[in-house]
C-alpha cells in the first residue's frame, strides 16, 4: 500500500503488537480452542502485513490456505478430541519436552546467527537483475514465480516451513 510514513509505521507497529499478543495467546492460553482461535488471529495479522508490504498474492494465499483451511482443520481437530486426555495428564514437563525445547532453541540460535552473519548484497543484486527480465514476460504466473524466488523468497520459505511443521504435527497426532 502506498500510505504516508506515519500511518504506515503505525499500522506496522499495530500489526506487530497483534502478532505478539496472538503468539502469546497461542502459547499461554490453557484452552486449546482459544489457542486455535489465537493462531487464526496471528495468521490474519501476517496476511495484513503482506498487504501492507504490497504483496497481495502472498496475502491472499495466506488467507485462503492457512486461515481458511489449516486453521479451520486445527479447530475441528481440537473440538473433536476427547477433553479427558487433557485433564488426566498431570505430568506437565517430560524429558522429551526438554530435549525438544533444547533442539528448537539450538535451531533458533543457529538460524539467528546465520541470518546475521550472511551478506545479503548478492540477493539484492539478483533482485535488481530480475527486474530487467520482468519487463519481457507476458504471463502473470511467470512474474509471480520470479517474485517468489527473488523479492519474496524469505516469506515464501517461512510459509513452507510452517506448512512442514503442520504436516509433521498432523502425522504425530495421527500416530497417537
From Swiss-Prot:
Its EC number is 7.1.1.-. It comes from the Eukaryota. It is found in: Plastid, Chloroplast thylakoid membrane. One of its GO terms (cellular component) is chloroplast thylakoid membrane. Keywords: Chloroplast, Membrane, NAD, NADP, Plastid, Plastoquinone, Quinone, Thylakoid, Translocase, Transmembrane, Transmembrane helix, Transport. InterPro entries: NAD(P)H-Q_Oxidoreduct_6 (IPR050290), NADH_UbQ/plastoQ_OxRdtase_su6 (IPR001457), Nuo/plastoQ_OxRdtase_6_NuoJ (IPR042106). Its main location: plastid. NDH is composed of at least 16 different subunits, 5 of which are encoded in the nucleus. This is NAD(P)H-quinone oxidoreductase subunit 6, chloroplastic. It comes from Barbarea verna (Land cress). The gene is ndhG.
Amino acid at each position: 500500500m502506498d500510505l504516508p510514513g506515519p500511518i504506515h509505521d503505525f499500522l506496522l507497529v499495530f500489526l506487530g503488537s497483534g502478532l505478539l499478543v496472538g503468539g502469546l495467546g497461542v502459547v499461554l492460553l490453557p484452552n486449546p480452542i482459544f489457542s486455535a482461535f489465537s493462531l487464526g488471529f496471528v495468521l490474519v495479522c501476517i496476511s495484513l502485513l503482506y498487504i501492507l508490504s504490497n504483496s497481495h498474492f502472498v496475502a491472499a494465499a495466506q488467507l485462503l490456505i492457512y486461515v481458511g483451511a489449516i486453521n479451520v482443520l486445527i479447530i475441528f481437530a481440537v473440538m473433536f478430541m476427547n477433553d479427558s486426555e487433557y485433564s488426566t495428564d498431570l505430568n506437565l514437563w517430560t524429558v522429551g519436552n526438554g530435549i525438544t525445547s533444547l533442539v528448537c532453541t539450538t535451531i533458533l540460535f543457529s538460524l539467528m546467527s546465520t541470518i546475521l552473519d550472511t551478506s545479503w548484497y548478492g540477493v539484492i543484486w539478483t533482485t535488481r537483475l530480475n527486474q530487467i527480465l520482468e519487463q519481457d514476460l507476458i504471463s502473470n504466473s511467470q512474474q509471480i514465480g520470479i517474485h517468489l524466488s527473488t523479492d519474496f523468497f524469505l516469506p515464501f520459505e517461512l510459509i513452507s516451513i510452517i506448512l512442514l511443521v503442520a504436516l509433521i504435527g498432523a502425522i504425530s497426532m495421527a500416530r497417537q
